[in-house]
A protein has these predicted regions:
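Active-site neighborhood of glycoside hydrolase catalytic domains
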Residues: 1-70, 75-87
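Flexible, acidic glycine-rich loops studded with aromatic residues
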Residues: 53-62, 66-70, 74-220
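Aromatic/hydrophobic beta-strand junction motif of beta-rich domains
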Residues: 222-227
Length: 228
């Protein structure tokens, strides 16, 4: 596979362009998304001629007009992954609100927040059945993927290796676990298992994130209990 993109396409100019409108008219198109289909189909043909298949972001299959030879990366939302698998596309499930590890983990921490603010507990909570994936759709799920985009890495000099570890661990551990065997045992059981790995990660030099302590207030006194 070669990933050819297709996300966040601004179709404003296509709607204004006389040449684009003429092309749509000649081909009986009414939706500008079909122009993206046309472009992607040409890309797919070039790849096929060289023995490759296209990987695309989920927006590229909005109309369902692309060949099912495409591999879809479902980043926008769980719904986008549901739509792609329902249309028969093999899909890498990676919705940002669960698996974009450049998202901040609490409102007070560093990172982006456009997709969600979440920690490893939310990652572990992802469940295909609860999200509505049918057995047929599950046959189109290639796997789960976590993502960390490079601009969030290079902007953190000089601490960027430590920052990458902090943002990815232990969220990536939770992702690996649910991709392997789901989350049927529940968070509390998994959390005990996860903390057993802390010494191992520390010995490996991984600068992982600890869960913040729990703070409560009652009758004029604060109580702080460590989560880790």
């Amino acid at each position: 596979y070669i990933h050819v993109g297709g996300d966040e396409v601004d179709m404003t100019q296509w709607n204004r362009c006389p040449d684009c409108q003429a092309l749509m008219s000649r081909r009986g198109m009414t939706d500008p998304h079909r122009l993206e289909d046309l472009f992607m189909e040409r890309m797919a043909a070039i790849l096929a001629a060289n023995g490759k298949r296209p990987g695309v972001w989920n927006e590229a299959v909005t109309t369902g007009g692309l060949s099912r030879e495409c591999l879809v990366y479902g980043w926008q939302s769980v719904k986008a992954c549901l739509d792609a698998t329902a249309k028969g596309y093999k899909t890498v499930v990676m919705p940002g609100e669960y698996f974009y590890f450049d998202m901040r983990q609490t409102p007070q921490e560093e990172g982006h927040d456009w997709a969600a603010v979440f920690d490893a507990k939310k990652v572990f909570g992802f469940d295909f059945t609860e999200k509505g994936f049918s057995d047929e759709q599950m046959r189109n799920v290639v796997g789960l993927q976590g993502t960390f985009f490079s601009e969030a890495y290079v902007s953190h000099e000089p601490e960027k290796p430590d920052y990458l570890d902090y943002m990815c661990f232990p969220r990536i551990c939770a992702l690996a676990r649910i991709a392997w065997r789901g989350n049927c045992e529940g968070w509390d059981a998994y959390y005990r298992e996860l903390t057993d790995h802390y010494d191992r990660m520390a010995a490996m030099g991984i600068r992982f994130r600890l869960f913040p302590p729990k703070v409560s207030y009652k009758e004029g006194a604060f109580t702080v209990v460590a989560d880790d």
